[in-house]
């Protein structure tokens, strides 16, 4: 088995496609939080010569999502950080996302997308997130698309290795009015199942929307 971000779509790992999206918007300085089979990711991206500066941070085998983000703090310092998972592809305009984040001036922006169902649900009033639930069986509304922007102060919301990003840290951001949603109505698809992979391969062959 290989880590999910290394599953290939169109002959390239998911993580490569995600980084390529950022690079097209001139974001080429990457910090990859390594966990399960992190050496596979490190080996592949150590050979990439696209002008990307890829830094590998071993965040531990059993560290939770919030803990992994917390461990990146000393490398990111006091800069605004763009953060994403390694299992979703989208045609998000990252310039617009960053502009939106700067305009509202809060600690966290999440990209909200329309489901294919079965994901964490977000309730939004205006642009402000009023509720964030990790999982939902609702078939409408907005879900967490996984493309975040965070300010340095947000790291203080994360207790340690056992923290789930999607629970206390983001729920605290909601309760303090520091969590806003950028609504993305374009293409978004995550890859959780073999069916998702087959679907993404089919989309790729027709002309990958995340590359346009």
Provide a role label for each language-model segment.
Residues 1-5:
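Short alpha-helical oligomerization interface
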Residues 7-8, 12-85, 94-96, 157, ...:
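Conserved N-terminal catalytic core of the sugar/cofactor nucleotidyltransferase
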Residues 19-20, 102, 106:
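Solvent-exposed alpha-helix faces
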Residues 80-82, 89, 95-102, 115-117, ...:
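Catalytic-core segments of class I nucleotidyltransferases/pyrophosphorylases
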Residues 104-114:
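A short, conserved acidic/glycine-rich loop-to-beta-strand motif
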Residues 121-124:
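Active-site and channel-lining beta-strand-loop segments
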